[in-house]
Amino acid sequence: MSLTAGLTDARPDTVETATVAVIGTGAIGRDLVSKIDRSPGLDCRLVAGRNPESAGLRYAESLGCATTAAGIDAVLAASPFDVVFDATSAASHRDHWPLLEPLGTLVIDLTPSKVGQMVAPTVTGVAAEDARNVNLISCGGQASVPVVHALAARFPVTYLEVVSTVASDVAGRATRLNLDEYVTATGHAVTTFSGVSDVKIILNISPAVPPATFRTVIHARVPDADAAAVRAVVDRAAEQVRSFAPGYEVVACTAADDLVTIVLKVTACSDVLPPYAGNLDIINAAAVLVAEQYAARPGRVSRTGVSS
């Protein structure tokens, strides 16, 4: 069921600020902290990493955030927070969740761990409801799920192939360690939200210079596909995604016989990322949107972490 009607009002003008912590200080963590800092509904109280010399910790300090190189242990010692973002790795998140679960904090997982409830805002809605662990699937999942969901709701799709390409210099260590988990989590999400069981997922890490802007290409088998009808469905889905990720666009959409090909590009809208790092931008934008919606939830009980 699509809950996209709620997206227009997903960022209320007045909300009670939610205290948050971020675990992970790589490129995705830096951009996440930047987006949180711009959000009137979120108050970043702690950024936790492992390397005291990391650029991510230095950046967080420059924004006035409390920082630590003690990782999850520091978050547990300083808790409770309203929201904890985990921007580490799938394996690390599996270790973190049993420690965070008893705290009652909303955990937003940006790794392909498959531990929590999958969220793609324009498909599932942005409210966390009663879930305490929300999983953002993957960058390719955030780019592809809205389109494959819309296609399958309108046409008899029999096969889906999702090929995403990211620039090498924004594919960090965790991304490279998570390749198997990425394929599994993205495939699971595509099948879950499209109902199509025959699915193939590919992730390319491109060393091209200049760096390649993040792209996701979707190939779909749709009997007797009508090009105009397909394009209309895809454009509507893309417009909804742009409500929270404005750099999301449809570059091409073709239909010939039973083969539909859709090319999506995401340009980062970020204070810290290069424009080609749309893979990080789209998943972070979705994560912040989930947190903002949670902050605005009626009856939410606030928690207090370390002072900023």
Swiss-Prot record:
Keyword Oxidoreductase: yes
Cross-referenced InterPro entries: Acetaldehyde_dehydrogenase, Acetylaldehyde_DH_C, NAD(P)-bd_dom_sf, Semialdehyde_DH_NAD-bd
Keywords, in A-Z order: Aromatic hydrocarbons catabolism, NAD, Oxidoreductase
UniProt binding sites for NAD(+): T25, G26, A27, I28, N279
SMART domains found in the cross-reference section: Semialdhyde_dh
Residues annotated as the enzyme's active site: C139 (acyl-thioester intermediate)
Entry EC no(s): 1.2.1.10
Gene Ontology process terms (BP): catabolic process
Reaction equation(s) it catalyzes: acetaldehyde + NAD(+) + CoA = acetyl-CoA + NADH + H(+)
GO molecular function: acetaldehyde dehydrogenase (acetylating) activity; NAD binding
Homology family: Belongs to the acetaldehyde dehydrogenase family.
Listed name of the protein: Acetaldehyde dehydrogenase
Naturally occurring in which organism (per UniProt): Streptomyces griseus subsp. griseus (strain JCM 4626 / CBS 651.72 / NBRC 13350 / KCC S-0626 / ISP 5235)
